């Protein structure tokens, strides 16, 4: 009897397990069918692997320019809209793609201006270094796109490293991101804040050295390419030996320490074959771009993110930065108006103070920077309507207030003021747009031109020469002085002595 009961129990268990296994097999088949269906659907929708996010900013700027001749220019209500469409895709844990499409336009149509018959989006505002930061037309452009490989065992030593190629995320870098309320991109914004194409490789040294956040990154970029357009000649895309050489840039970023609270970054670069507009100084005729030489630069930037363990100072940010540049002109040519190698420097510091826990009532920021006579960074893409404040040969200050209205919506009020001591802060690298001349000296020369009888009529130079000779100068001295005074008088109406930009924006990010 006991054997019969035991046999019955074993039979029942076997049947039950058999039934359960059958159900499991059926479920697995259903899962496999669903996987095939999902794969088919994903294939039809490009696998739906690119993740999109939106950053839409609508702003109004009140801008003003005080010209060196005493006149003013400006725009009381420059309204614009900027759209960033962000893309991200990870093929696996080591390979990442990131990109950003950009649209940046003033409200309304553009019929050209008296200074240019070309509307916005067809002149220098399409220059590759700033094309997505300038107000252009209704077109959507590519701000950055790159792939990134992330390794974790360099040389078999367990060292983290990365390598990346593409159009770089090189705008709004370290420290400049604070006023922009953005994450910092890679470059130190004190010396590099432009769009460019290139590559980078980074090694994490923290595990080797035991120093928090230590890393070393090498970067290389192409600022311009010398190649004939398609079908413009029989040799499409061949190098034009009579044109400017391609502009290139190499450098490194070394972070000696970063524990999340104390962040120190340094950078050095060299840029080669840099241009400026060649101008006939007698007639003012523009003769096209010309190569003038090379430049090098370096920066040391420090951020303290939190001064105490708790309270308002725990979320306060303080920063300071020092940067240096040095020109290397080609033989017989002048860079920044000088035929000698000239060094320039700049210092920059600021503070950001949140009000309320987690900036419940917003954050106030204040910044100040100063640049010397021959200071020359690559900061053309800095986000103001009045040019780069960090490029100033003089003084600039900024105050801003940022408030998070909702999870997705924020506002900012920002005021930037720039006072120039020298010309050429937002120019290129030669002896025309980039030339550094004391604005006070130019004003004195223009005043002397008028005092000696000079007018806008070129023929008045004879009266100026005669009056100078009557004051005791030789004819050659008088002619040379009259030429300098006449150039100063002609330049004066186009020299900005100070500028201001007040901006208010609403920004949606999700």
Question: Which residues fall in each region the model found?
Answer:
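Residues on the lipid-exposed face of transmembrane beta-strands in outer-membrane beta-barrel proteins
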Residues: 83-89, 144-149, 199-203, 252-256, ...
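Outer-membrane beta-barrel strand-turn architecture
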Residues: 46, 89-93, 151-157, 205-210, ...
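Transmembrane beta-strands of outer-membrane beta-barrel pores
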Residues: 58-64, 93, 103-107, 167-171, ...
